[in-house]
Amino acid sequence: MRVLPAAMLVGAATAAVPPFQQVLGGNGAKHGADHAAEVPADHSADGFSKPLHAFQEELKSLSDEARKLWDEVASFFPESMDQNPLFSLPKKHNRRPDSHWDHIVRGSDVQSVWVTGENGEKEREVDGKLEAYDLRVKKTDPGSLGIDPGVKQYTGYLDDNENDKHLFYWFFESRNDPENDPVVLWLNGGPGCSSLTGLFMELGPSSINKKIQPVYNDYAWNSNASVIFLDQPVNVGYSYSNSAVSDTVAAGKDVYALLTLFFKQFPEYAKQDFHIAGESYAGHYIPVFASEILSHKKRNINLQSVLIGNGLTDGYTQYEYYRPMACGDGGYPAVLDESSCQSMDNALPRCQSMIESCYSSESAWVCVPASIYCNNALLAPYQRTGQNVYDVRGKCEDSSNLCYSAMGYVSDYLNKPEVIEAVGAEVNGYDSCNFDINRNFLFHGDWMKPYHRLVPGLLEQIPVLIYAGDADFICNWLGNKAWTEALEWPGQAEYASAELEDLVIVDNEHTGKKIGQVKSHGNFTFMRLYGGGHMVPMDQPESSLEFFNRWLGGEWF
């Protein structure tokens, strides 16, 4: 049996599944012949086998029970590590000269600014270790690409010069009132999927049609907010590096640096309310990234709330709801037969026991087996049916593009030389999802770690919205509702007992139309969105923009 990625588009689970299961990725997986054209010598097949040998040596020091568990996990591995590398290969790239960019913000310059504090003593204007970071900014001509003409746009890179990491971003100013509208950072998941898929498939100002042309989106989230789309971690989308990020905490440092330098360059946006939104594996990212921002008392980031859509945040609670969602208890017909449903029920106690051990130790030695066992036992039965894991209502129509042909259109568009040139990208090819990164995070134990424990700390300071399209399987609404009710925080009892109420459109010609359900107490809100799959803004664009605008307006907090 081979380890193959059971990818969650914008939230991928690396699960052990039967060898006939198609590797999801298509155009997103190493697009173009130049993807790995420049590979360091130590990234040979022999180089990749070394981690496995070291890994096997470490196993000798474990208890008999732990070794038995790892022997079971090892049966899921390919014989040769060059078939399943634990490190992402560097992308071929060509760095543009400084003269190409309109602005370069040096982290060392920002770090050198001292001010007089309230106690009369000198202190840095902003906190954080920024010396190694630079931000490169290019004002992009909307007319050259036909994407939201008339709307101000910036693209560029955050450079971590110490670790040779370069994160690509694309900023769109609000169509409405940019001097007063909030700013939102959007993050897709994976781990290892580009946020530009969210831009062009979900909530950005344009989608890409079959002719590989941009099409105006009336329901774009920059209708009433300025939005930053960030390709992170490195080696995702247009981002690149010769090093790697393998856990969510490390990625959080980069995001803090990006925002700090961006708002330093553009103080007109820094004064606006700021929010972080994302989906799927962003259920891991966002609690960490928001906590990182809030940990800095001296900051220029006006964080007001976070929004997580169809996220994976608390595996212990959420994995319990794969069987109900697959077996007809989530509001849609059953996908699995009774025998498969029973096998999932039988596997759940062991799965939760393993996750519980992961939560206690937070050790990769415990968390990795939990991820692989639980994904194999509770995700693979659904995958084998050929049904779309992101939408229980239909089959996976395009397995080479994570079930959606539109992802292939996006990849084709972003690989056009004229697009790469217009946005200043420095890689020779764009890939929508990098499954090497997915494995990096998995084998560092990140997948099952208890990042939900950070949410109570967020609730003390800012509002948190958990929303879920109710047709998604992979990060389904049942599990998301359940973990929010199980979360221990001062308002738990009142929140858990709150009833779901109708969510209706209030501000357009469809006023009164029911689009979902909502419950809220204090700073915590959950929404179920009717008819939405894993990507709510793609499936239900009107409903998506409705709740988004109202959330930013403070209706539920």
Curated annotation (Swiss-Prot):
SUPFAM superfamilies: alpha/beta-Hydrolases
GO molecular function, one term: serine-type carboxypeptidase activity
Segment forming the signal sequence: 1-17
Cysteine disulfide links: C193-C433, C327-C341, C351-C374, C358-C367, C396-C403
Propeptide residue interval(s): 18-138
Residues carrying covalently attached carbohydrate according to the record: N224, N523
Gene Ontology biological process terms, A to Z: proteolysis
Protein name according to UniProt: Carboxypeptidase Y homolog A
Gene name of the record: cpyA
